C-alpha cells in the first residue's frame, strides 16, 4: 500500500522543468546513461533521461488502447500547464516493463535523475538516480518504492537509528574501555554511515517528541517499560547539530515502590560461561589446531589496556583462538587474535582475562544488542514523524526490556564523554568539503519509589574542516558513502591527530593512514531550505524563497537546478553563514525532576498513582 499522496510536494520543480528538454542529448549503452554538459544558459537546461529507443504506453481514463510515445515526445508535446493536467491519465507504462510507472515517477525522474560523463550505473528504466557530487544513489521505482519521496521515508529512519545506536554504542564502549582508550573508539563507526546520517538530519524536523510504553511480567511483578525520546535540531555558525535525549524508565506497576528492581532481574551470562563458549565469543571461526601460525605472539602480565607492545584499540581483537603449543605455553592461558595478526596470551584465571572478555568479546555481543535496541527506537521515532507506522515495509520490533535492564545495572550514576571526532569527505559539484562529525554522549541514572530512570544524552554535530591538500585530484566514482572519499583502499572508520583508520573492502583489517595537516578557512554556503522544497507550500513559496535572503546569493541554487541544490544540501551540513549563530553554547540537557516523576505515572488509569491523588 503506497503512502498517502501529499499535495504537490516534490513535483513542483519537475513541472517547471518539463519545457527544458531540448538542450541535452542522451544515449543508452550497456545500462549506462551519459549527458552532454549543460549549455551556457543553465536556466533552460535539463538532461534527457530516456532516449528514443524506450517507449511508454499512455493510458487515459476512457480509452483502453494506449498511445506509444517516448519520454521526450511526451514532454515536448505538453506545455507546463498541460503537464499539470496529466494527473488524469492512468499511468506512464514502459512497454516492456511490467510494474506501472506513474506520472509521479516520471516527475521524480525529471527532477532528480542527474548523470555525468562517468555514467550513472543505474538501470535506466527502473531506477532514478541522485547525485551527491561524485556519489550516485539509485532509487528503485517499484510498486512500493516511488522515487525520491521514498528515499526520504527510507533513509530518514535509517539515519536517525544510526545516530541513536552509534551514540549509545560509543558511550557503552567508552565506559568499558572496549579498545583501551577513554577517548577514541572504533566500534560504533562500523554502524555509522555518514551519508545516511547527514541526509536524515536534513529530513528531520526541528523538534520531535515520542513516548512508547510496553508492559511485561517478570516473576510475579507487573512491569512497564517507558521510553521517552526528545529530539532537537540546532543550526549554528559551525554547522548543524541534533541533540537527542532518550529516557528509559522501568516501572513496577503493582506496588508502591516496593522491590521495583524485580522488574530488572533477567537472566545474565557469566564471564566464565563466555570464556568456555566459543559461540559466545562472537561466533568467530577459529583456526584449526594443527595450523602453524607465522605471527608474533605477545605475552603480558599487565592489564590489556596497558600492554607495552601495542595499543589494542589500534588493533581490534576479533577472535578467540583455541589453546595449543604453537600459541601459548599451556592450557592455563587463553589466546586472543587481533585484526592485524597479533596473538595475545593471558592466564585463564587472571582478572585481566575476564576484563578483556567482558570489554571486548562479550562487549561485541552486548553492543550489538544495544544498537538493535537503539535502532528500534530510532526507527520508531522516524516512523512516527513520517506517519509510516502500520504500512507495509515498515519493520518495528519490540524493545527488549532485558537490554534496558542491563543498561540500568551497567551504566554509572553519571558519565559524560569528551567529543569524539570523525572526519568525512563531502564532495560537491562546486568544490570538495572536509567535514568533521563530533559526537558527545552522557548518561544520568536516578531511582524513584516505584521505578528506575536511565537517561542517555547524545549530541551529534557536523562542522566544516578543510585540508591544504586536494583530496579529489584523483577522482574515484561509486563510493558507498561519503567516508570512503578519504580512503582509497576502503571506508574510513575513524580519524584523529593526523591518523586515519580505514577498513578495506575485501577484509576486516584496520589500516592506518597519515593525513596532511588541516586548516579551516571561511566559506560562504548558499542554501535553499530542503524542508520547504518538499513541503505542501507549492511553487509560489519556492519562487519567493529564490528571492529571499536565505537564497539570494549570486551562486544560489535555482529551482530548475536541483543537482546543484542537492550538492548544497551537504555543503550546508558542514557550514552555516554567521547570521545563524547559536545564542548559547551546546549544553547537556535533562528534564526536571518533576518531569521525571511524571514519566512514571502508570498508563493503566485503574492503578493508583504513586504520587498521591494522581493530579499533576
From Swiss-Prot:
Its GO CC terms?
host cell endoplasmic reticulum lumen; viral envelope
Alphabetically list the UniProt keywords.
Answer: Glycoprotein, Host endoplasmic reticulum, Host-virus interaction, Late protein, Signal, Viral attachment to host cell, Viral attachment to host entry receptor, Viral envelope protein, Virion, Virus entry into host cell
An example Gene Ontology biological process: symbiont entry into host cell
Kindly list the cysteine pairs connected by disulfide bridges: none
Its main subcellular localisation, reduced to a broad class, is virion
Spans through the membrane: none
Please verify whether the record's keywords include Glycoprotein.
yes
Is Glycoprotein one of the keywords? yes
Q: Which residues have a glycan attached per UniProt?
A: 23, 44, 282, 330, 351
Describe how it is modified after translation.
Glycosylated by host.
Q: What does this protein do?
A: Plays a role in virus entry by participating in host receptor binding at the cell surface.
Q: What is this protein called?
A: Glycoprotein Q1
**What species is given as this protein's source?**
Human herpesvirus 6B (strain Z29) (HHV-6 variant B)
Q: What is the lineage of its organism?
A: Viruses, Duplodnaviria, Heunggongvirae, Peploviricota, Herviviricetes
Amino acid at each position: 500500500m503506497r503512502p498517502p499522496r501529499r499535495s504537490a510536494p516534490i513535483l513542483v520543480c519537475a513541472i517547471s522543468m518539463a519545457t527544458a528538454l531540448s538542450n541535452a542529448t542522451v544515449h543508452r549503452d550497456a545500462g549506462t546513461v551519459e549527458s552532454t554538459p549543460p549549455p551556457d544558459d543553465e536556466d533552460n537546461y535539463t538532461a534527457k533521461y530516456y532516449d528514443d529507443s524506450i517507449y511508454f504506453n499512455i493510458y487515459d481514463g476512457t480509452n483502453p488502447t494506449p498511445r506509444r510515445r517516448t519520454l521526450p515526445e511526451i514532454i515536448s508535446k505538453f506545455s507546463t500547464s498541460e503537464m499539470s493536467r496529466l494527473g488524469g491519465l492512468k499511468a506512464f507504462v514502459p512497454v516492456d516493463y511490467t510494474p506501472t510507472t506513474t506520472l509521479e515517477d516520471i516527475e521524480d525522474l525529471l527532477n532528480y535523475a542527474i548523470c555525468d560523463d562517468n555514467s550513472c550505473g543505474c538501470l535506466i528504466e527502473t531506477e532514478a538516480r541522485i547525485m551527491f557530487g561524485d556519489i550516485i544513489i539509485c532509487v528503485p521505482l517499484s510498486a512500493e518504492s516511488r522515487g525520491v519521496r521514498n528515499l526520504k521515508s527510507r533513509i530518514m529512519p535509517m539515519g536517525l537509528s544510526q545516530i541513536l545506536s552509534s551514540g549509545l554504542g560509543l558511550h557503552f564502549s567508552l565506559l568499558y574501555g572496549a579498545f583501551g582508550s577513554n577517548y577514541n573508539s572504533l566500534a560504533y563507526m562500523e554502524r555509522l554511515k555518514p551519508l545516511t546520517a547527514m541526509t536524515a538530519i536534513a529530513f528531520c524536523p526541528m523538534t520531535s517528541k515520542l513516548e512508547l510504553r510496553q508492559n511485561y511480567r517478570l516473576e510475579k511483578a507487573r512491569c512497564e517499560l517507558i521510553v521517552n525520546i526528545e529530539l532537537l535540531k540546532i543550526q549554528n555558525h559551525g554547522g548543524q547539530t541534533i541533540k537527542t535525549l532518550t529516557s528509559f524508565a522501568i516501572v513496577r506497576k503493582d506496588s508502591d515502590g516496593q522491590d521495583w528492581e524485580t522488574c530488572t532481574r533477567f537472566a545474565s551470562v557469566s564471564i566464565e560461561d563466555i570464556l568456555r563458549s566459543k559461540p559466545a565469543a562472537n561466533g568467530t571461526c577459529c583456526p584449526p589446531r594443527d595450523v602453524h601460525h607465522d605471527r608474533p605472539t605477545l605475552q603480558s602480565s599487565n592489564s590489556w589496556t596497558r600492554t607495552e607492545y601495542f595499543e589494542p584499540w589500534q588493533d581490534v581483537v576479533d577472535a578467540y583462538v583455541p589453546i595449543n603449543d604453537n600459541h601459548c605455553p599451556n592450557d592455563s592461558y587463553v589466546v586472543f587474535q587481533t585484526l592485524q595478526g597479533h596473538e595475545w596470551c593471558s592466564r585463564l584465571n587472571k582478572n585481566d582475562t575476564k576484563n578483556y572478555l567482558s570489554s571486548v568479546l562479550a562487549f561485541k555481543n552486548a553492543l550489538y544488542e544495544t544498537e538493535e535496541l537503539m535502532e528500534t527506537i530510532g526507527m520508531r521515532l522516524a516512523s512516527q514523524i513520517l506517519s509510516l507506522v502500520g504500512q507495509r515495509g515498515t519493520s518495528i520490533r519490540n524493545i527488549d526490556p532485558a537490554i534496558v535492564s542491563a543498561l540500568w545495572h551497567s551504566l554509572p550514576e553519571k558519565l559524560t564523554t569528551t567529543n569524539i571526532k570523525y572526519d568525512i569527505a563531502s564532495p560537491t559539484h562546486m568544490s570538495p568539503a572536509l567535514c568533521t562529525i563530533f559526537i558527545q554522549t552522557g548518561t544520568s541514572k536516578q531511582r524513584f519509589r516505584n521505578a528506575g530512570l536511565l537517561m542517555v544524552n547524545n549530541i551529534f554535530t557536523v562542522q566544516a574542516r578543510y585540508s591544504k591538500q586536494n583530496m579529489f585530484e584523483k577522482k574515484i566514482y561509486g563510493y558507498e558513502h561519503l567516508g570512503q572519499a578519504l580512503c582509497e583502499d576502503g571506508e574510513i572508520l575513524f580519524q584523529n591527530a593526523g591518523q586515519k583508520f580505514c577498513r578495506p573492502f575485501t577484509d576486516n583489517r584496520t589500516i592506518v593512514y597519515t593525513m596532511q595537516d588541516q586548516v579551516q578557512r571561511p566559506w560562504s554556503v548558499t542554501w535553499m531550505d530542503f524542508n520547504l522544497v518538499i513541503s505542501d507550500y507549492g511553487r509560489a513559496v519556492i519562487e519567493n524563497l529564490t528571492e529571499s535572503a536565505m537564497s539570494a546569493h549570486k551562486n544560489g541554487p535555482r529551482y530548475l537546478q536541483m543537482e546543484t541544490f542537492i550538492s548544497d544540501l551537504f555543503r550546508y551540513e558542514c557550514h552555516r553563514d554567521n547570521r545563524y549563530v547559536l545564542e548559547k553554547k551546546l549544553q547537556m540537557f535533562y528534564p526536571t525532576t518533576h518531569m521525571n516523576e511524571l514519566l512514571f505515572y502508570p498508563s493503566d488509569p485503574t492503578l493508583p498513582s504513586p504520587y498521591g491523588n494522581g493530579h499533576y
